[in-house]
From Swiss-Prot:
Superkingdom per UniProt: Bacteria
Segments passing through the bilayer: 6-26, 35-55
The protein's name in its UniProt record: UPF0391 membrane protein BBta_5399
Primary localisation category: membrane
One GO cellular component term noted in the UniProt record for this chain: plasma membrane
């Protein structure tokens, strides 16, 4: 992906985040993001532990 495509992608993400942040659904989005953060944190830690122990090559 070229740098211009990356810049366009991050621009779109920032516009969507700005729209969600300046409307009333920001609290709901924050709750969903918090839940997803903890889910992916647990998945990361489990895979990290498995990678360091069981699946060592």
């Amino acid at each position: 992906m070229t740098i211009l495509k990356w810049a366009l992608l991050f621009f779109v993400i920032s516009v969507v985040a700005g729209i969600l942040g300046f409307t009333g659904i920001s609290a709901a989005s924050a709750d969903i993001a918090r839940i997803l953060f903890y889910i992916f944190l647990v998945i990361f830690l489990v895979l990290l532990i498995l990678g360091l122990t069981i699946f060592r090559v």
